[in-house]
Amino acid sequence: MIRSVLSLAAVATCAIGVVAHADVEDAQRVTHEHMRAFANPSGYAATYSSAGFIDTANPFFQSLGSNGRSCASCHQQSEGWTVTPEGVQKRFHASHGTDPIFRLNDGANSPLADVSTLAARREAYSMLLSKGLIRVGIGIPENAEFELLKVDDPYGYASAKELSLFRRPLPTTNLKFLSTVMWDARETFKDPASRDCLAGTTSCFASVHFDLADQSNAATAGHAQAAQPLTSAQRESIVTFELGLFTAQVTDHAAGRLTALHARGGPQHAAQQTFYFGINDVLAGDYRTHAAFTPLAFNLFDAWANPPAERDDGHERVEARRAVARGQALFNTKPIQITRVKGLNDDLHLPVIQGSCTSCHDATNAGNHSVPAPLDIGLTDKARRTADMPLYTLRHKLTAELIETTDPGRALLTGKWQDVGRFKGPVLRGLAARAPYFHNGSAKDLNEVVDFYNQRFGVGLSPVEKADLVAFLRAL
C-alpha cells in the first residue's frame, strides 16, 4: 500500500499564501506524521486521518470514469477537501483550461458551451472559476405540486427538463458528523428498519455509511461519467477513507495555536468528538441522554474566556484568544428572533421563534443539524440573485402562487411546494480553508456570512460582535 505522508516543512513550502515564520512554528507544534497542514488566509488548517496516513492509492484518488476525473478533482485536501476559486484558477492557468475539473457535463455553465479556444473556455467555466460552483442538472418531477412558468438563464440552457443549479462541492471530511448527505438531501435514504428515527415519528433513516456508499457511485457515474457502477469493494474503500478524515483550523494568525492553554481546536479533538443521530436536537432534546436541548453547542474555546499569557505571548495574542471565546459565546447565546424560515417557522406554526445560531447549528462542536432538517433561510430569493445566476419562476398548480428562485433545492426531489429553497446546513469545521460560503458561494468570506445573518434576522450585532463572531468561525 502506498502511503502519502508529508511533513509540515514540506507542506509549508508548497502551501498557498505566505505566512510569518511564527505561524509556521505554531503549526509545526500541533502537527505530526498523522496530519497534513495547508495555509489559508487565516492561518493553517490540517487534516487528521484515523488511519494514520492519507492513502493516495485509495480509489478516491483514482480516475474511475471516462473523463479523467477522480473524487479528488473536486475535493482537494489543500482547499478544505472541496475547491476554492483560487485553486481552480491555478489549475486553469496551468492546464489552459483542460484539467479534468474542466468538463462540459457539470464544470461548464452549460453543457453546450463553446470550449474550442482558451478564451471560450474561460467564459464557459466562469462560475467554476469565480465561485467554485459545479452545475447540477435536475428536472421538475412529473408529479410536482408546481410547474416551471419562466426561465431566465444567462447561459441559455435550463428548462423544465433540466434546471441548471450552481452549487459548491461539499467537503469530503468530517463526515462522521453528517445526518444529511448532499445539499438537497438527495443521498439521504429512508430505512424503516433503522433506529435512527425523527423523534415521535416513523420517519427513519439509513446509516450515513450507506448513504455515502450510494453517493460515491452516483458521483462517479455523473461527475466522472463512468460507464460502469463502482464495485462494492470500491465503494467501501472510498467511504472508509472519507469517514476517517477530520479537518479543522490548527493555527490562527492572530490567536496562534488553537490548542493552546487547554483550548480544543484542531482536527484531533474533532476526531474525538461524540456524535450520534439526534444529539442535542433543538426540537426534541438529546435522543440518547434525553437531556433538554442546550444552546451551548460549542465549548472548544471555553478556556480562552480569560486566558493567561503563555511565555512568549503578547497582549495582541491574548486579546485575539478572548475574541474567539467571545465569538463562541455569541454563537451559542446571542438572541435571534427566527422568522420566515421554511422548515422551522411554518412546520411548527410559530411566526417567531426565540433562538440563537445554535438553534439551527445544534450538533455539538460540529455545527450542523444532528437530524435531517433542510431549511429555507432566503438564500435563493430573487432579491439575492446575481446576474450570473439563473432565475426560475415557479407556479403552484392549485393556488397559482408564484415563487422566483435561483434554486428550488429539495423541492426538485420531493415535488413539494413547501420544500422550495430548502437546503441542509453544513458542518462548520475547517471553514477558513474553503471560501466562498453557502450552497451557492454567495458569501465571499466569513464577514459576509455574518452580515447576511445579521441583516436577515435583524440581530443588531455591534462591529465588535461581528469581529468576534468571525474570529470564532475562522478558528473552527
Regions from the PLM with identified roles:
Residues 7-17:
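Bacterial N-terminal signal peptides
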Residues 1-4:
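Positively charged n-region of N-terminal signal peptides that target proteins for export
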Residues 22-476:
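Periplasmic c-type cytochrome electron-transfer domains
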